[in-house]
Amino acid sequence: MTIRVGIAGATGYTGVELVRLLAQHPEAEVVVAGTESYQGQHLAAVYPHLRERVDLVGREASPEALAGCDVVFTSLPHGLTMALAPAVLAAGGRLIDLGADFRLRDVTAYEQWYRKTHTAPDLMEEAVYGLPELYRERIRGARLVGNPGCYPTACALAAAPLLQAGVVETEGIIFDAKSGVSGAGRGVNLGVHFSEVNENFKAYNIAGTHRHTPEIEQTLSDLAGRPVVVSFTPHLVPMTRGILATGYFTLKAERTTEQLVDLFREFYAGEPFVRVRPAGELPTTKQVWGSNYCDIGLQVDPRTRRVLVISVIDNLVKGAAGQAIQNMNLLFGLPETTGLLNAGPVYP
C-alpha cells in the first residue's frame, strides 16, 4: 500500500527537500503540498529543478485537506504545528514535526526558550524524539515524532558513543559548530544576503542563547544518565549546505585515537547512515552533501587529555528532511534506508 503523504510547509527549503526525496520513494506519494505563499501554483514553477519529477500544486494545509493522509510532515515556524497536530492525530494520521514544537519534553523549557505558550502539552509528553540511531524502538510505535534539529543531530551523534560508554567527563563539554546559509531558511533576511555572507564568517547566538542548546542537553543527559550542560557556539559560513560540529570532551583515563575509533565503530555497527572514519582521517561537509549520512572522525589530544570529534551532515537532509523520511520508514515498518540511498552524496 502506498503511503499517502501530506506536507505542511512544502515550499521552504526543508519542505522542498522533502518533496525532492519523496519523489524517489517507492512506497510513498505526496498528495498534499501545503503552502501559504504559493497556493494554486505548481511546485515545479516555484522550484524548476523539480520539473518532470513532481506534479504538485500548492494548496492550504488545512486539517480537512490533511485528513486523508497516512502521515503528515510539518515544516513550519515554531508555534504552528502544535495547533495542527491534534486534528491530524484525531483523523488517524501520524505526524512528523520538522519544527521545534515537539522536540523538548519539558513544557517549561519550551516556553522559556521559544517564548510561546505550548497549547498541546499532552502531545508534547507523547511525542518521541526522532533520532533513529538512539531512539529507534520508541519511534517504531509512535504517532507523533519530533524530528531533531540540524545542530543537535550532528552534536548528539558525535557524543553518543563516548557518553554511553562513560569514558568522558560530563562536565566541560564544548560544541563548536558551523552551518551553511540554507539553515536560516528561505525568507528574506539581511543577515544572509550574498553581500553579507560572502567572504565572511561569524558566530551568532553564543554563550548558551541558541535555541538548540536545551535539545542538545536533553539528548546528552539521556545518554549520560544525569544532567549535562554544554557550551554551544554556532557559526554561519558562506556555503549553501552542510554542518560541521566539533565536540571537545575530557577523557576520564588515557585512551588512544585508535581505541576510540573502535568504540565508535562498535557503537554504530549496522547503522546505515553513520560512517566512522579511520584514525587519521577527518570528514568534510562536501563528502555528505545531498545525502542522509553523518560522517564522523576523531582524534585524541594527549597533551590536554581531550578527544575532539568532528561530525558532518547535510543540514537539509540528515539534519531535516532525510531524517524525517528515515523516521517515516520506521513508523510504517519499511527498511529505514528506503528512498534515501540514491540521495547523494553529490561531489564535488
UniProtKB/Swiss-Prot annotation:
Primary residence: cytoplasm
Keyword Cytoplasm: yes
Leading EC class: oxidoreductase
CDD domains: AGPR_1_C, AGPR_1_N
Subcellular location per the Swiss-Prot or TrEMBL entry: Cytoplasm
Metal-binding among keywords: no
Catalyzed chemical reaction(s): N-acetyl-L-glutamate 5-semialdehyde + phosphate + NADP(+) = N-acetyl-L-glutamyl 5-phosphate + NADPH + H(+)
GO cellular component, one term: cytoplasm
GO MF entry, a single one: N-acetyl-gamma-glutamyl-phosphate reductase activity
Pathway entry: Amino-acid biosynthesis; L-arginine biosynthesis; N(2)-acetyl-L-ornithine from L-glutamate: step 3/4
Catalytic residues (positions): 150
GO biological process: L-arginine biosynthetic process
Known EC number: 1.2.1.38
Coiled-coil ranges (or none): none
Keyword annotations: Amino-acid biosynthesis, Arginine biosynthesis, Cytoplasm, NADP, Oxidoreductase
UniProt similarity note: Belongs to the NAGSA dehydrogenase family. Type 1 subfamily.
Function: Catalyzes the NADPH-dependent reduction of N-acetyl-5-glutamyl phosphate to yield N-acetyl-L-glutamate 5-semialdehyde.
HAMAP family on file: ArgC_type1
Name of the protein in its database record: N-acetyl-gamma-glutamyl-phosphate reductase
Source organism of the structure: Symbiobacterium thermophilum (strain DSM 24528 / JCM 14929 / IAM 14863 / T)
Phylogenetic classification of the source organism: Bacteria, Bacillati, Bacillota, Clostridia, Eubacteriales
